[in-house]
Amino acid sequence: MAITPESEMSPEVLSWRDPEMPSVKGTEKPKDPSKGYIALLGWSVNAIKAAQNFDRRYIVVAPEWAADFCTANNIPFIPWDFLRLNDKSMEIATRLKEEGVDVAVPLFEETVEWSGAINSVLMDSPRMFGQSILFRDKALMKRRAQLGGIRVGIFEEAHEKEDIVRFMKRVNQTLLKLDGDPDDPIHVKAFDKAGCLGHRMIRTLDEIDQIPDEEYPLLMESHLSGWEFAVEAWIHDGKIQFLNISEYVTLGYSVFVPATRELESWREAITKQIELLIKTFDIKFGLIHPEYFVTADGEMYFGEVAYRPPGFKAFELIEKAYGFSAYQASMLVFDPKSTKEEVAAFFPKEVEGAKGYAGCFGVYPRRRVVSKLEMPKECIDHPYFDYHELVAPTEETVPDRNAFGTHWGLVFFFGDDPIKMRDLLKSQEDLDFYV
């Protein structure tokens, strides 16, 4: 893929130049032509920097708006609209195959099925596209898990409000609720959105009316009481190479890695569940990000699984804690030319290899009207405070939070005590960052 000389770049394009990019500084790692050629599907500057510091050739496939940045920073780039689905969708797979690309790595949720479709062509394995659909459609995902003997809660699909009403009543009838007893909550989720997007907890029948018609169809699930956590597992040749347990402090707010000793005590049982997941979904390689619940009596329930980097900058947290690039790890296990020895040598020992505990907190304004960003002293004066990505508000009125909502930015922490980290992250919920 040809790189545009600086002399041919316009001032507008050059305004996008990042002097810290290895490709600009001249420090990019030489590429080994005997190793795989990676296509990164989607957009992540951190993933691009990781690719530049890795020994694999790479190319970025992202929307047209990324073109000037890529040109300015000497990044090999193919523009592609991932929202466009038509009879020309095969073009990108054909073009990447002609380019000599070996594998496509998805960087966000909307590129997972694209990676499946492209890899089915690059690797001549049609089943890979069907597998990617299982990772994108949460109803199909749950059914596949059930077929594999994985424990899940009660779930159904909702196409209209009345479906949710019936489901909520049926779940509570199953739980032998009597008249006057408070209902157990249920959850509704978008079929194909990442993380907390479109995720609502419904506690009363009246709350169902708050769901806009355009959000249907939805997946409905019974509420699982227990300890919710996430896993990031890198898989090569059908086997787990590295398994991180991410501990949620409050869902949608905070997470840290590695987990506390209490949650890590479940590692053997969690590993068995991940091995069952790999077998059930026939996963040969890649990075998976499943979520589970552990109940008080030790039962483990499957929530969902994603085939792309997690939200809340979990890859960056893992790199901070362990020292290896999680993006490079994904490129390594996706690459069909990687050897077992190379993969084994890349990863440190789980938990023991960590240099400390890395966590982050997603900030939501607690006030209806705000005028400025003001970092609380309780946050920035704490010895565990690392950095933040918050910016000044662009408007004074805070929009209503939809479902679990989308945070306004992340605050990062690093320290040597997981209990202090957990308590610190929890305490951030009582602070005002926007005033």
Task: Go through each PLM region and give its residues.
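A conserved helix-loop-beta module that forms one wall/lid of the active-site cleft
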Residues: 120-206
